[in-house]
Amino acid sequence: MLKKFFLPDEFVKNIFHITPEKLKERNVKGIITDLDNTLVEWDRPNATPRLIEWFEEMKEHGIKVTIVSNNNERRVKLFSEPLGIPFIYKARKPMGKAFNRAVRNMELKKEDCVVIGDQLLTDVLGGNRNGYHTILVVPVASSDGFITRFNRQVERRILSALKRKGHIQWEE
């Protein structure tokens, strides 16, 4: 059960290791990505210049991006709107409704999309439960909000169990 729900299909150090070329090899046309601690630190209000370049590179290669966050409208809107990136706030991940809405809004199929995030309990679990290819990234910041701190404790136990069973080879 752990493997089925919590094992990501891929693990990368950060969002910048996900390139259009690698996505095109898998025929990916759309990205559903978390915001906080995936794209930027949870308390950073806007995108870094490097992240802006990453978004532009995806767009140039015809890969659509939608930000799907459990955070509130104000936070997600203030980050996403200046970039022209579609977003869904209060997503209630790991529930699948927001993932599926993002796919519909991008006018793609589930098979054409990947889910990217920094949390097993929201991003990976939600993506896996709903049949998406999942990519786990190392959190951008070492600090978290209150609820996420609790989730991280649970995630450490899950990662440890997956590692013990030989399902993962990366270092935490």
UniProtKB/Swiss-Prot annotation:
<dbReference type="Pfam" id="PF13242">
    <property type="entry name" value="Hydrolase_like"/>
</dbReference>
<dbReference type="InterPro" id="IPR006439">
    <property type="entry name" value="HAD-SF_hydro_IA"/>
</dbReference>
<dbReference type="InterPro" id="IPR023214">
    <property type="entry name" value="HAD_sf"/>
</dbReference>
<dbReference type="Pfam" id="PF08282">
    <property type="entry name" value="Hydrolase_3"/>
</dbReference>
<dbReference type="GO" id="GO:0008962">
    <property type="term" value="F:phosphatidylglycerophosphatase activity"/>
</dbReference>
<dbReference type="InterPro" id="IPR036412">
    <property type="entry name" value="HAD-like_sf"/>
</dbReference>
<protein>
    <recommendedName>
        <fullName>Probable phosphatase YqeG</fullName>
        <ecNumber>3.1.3.-</ecNumber>
    </recommendedName>
</protein>
<dbReference type="GO" id="GO:0005737">
    <property type="term" value="C:cytoplasm"/>
</dbReference>
<dbReference type="InterPro" id="IPR010021">
    <property type="entry name" value="PGPP1/Gep4"/>
</dbReference>
<dbReference type="InterPro" id="IPR006549">
    <property type="entry name" value="HAD-SF_hydro_IIIA"/>
</dbReference>
<keyword id="KW-0378">Hydrolase</keyword>
<comment type="function">
    <text>Has low dephosphorylation activity on GMP and glucose-6-phosphate.</text>
</comment>
<dbReference type="GO" id="GO:0016791">
    <property type="term" value="F:phosphatase activity"/>
</dbReference>
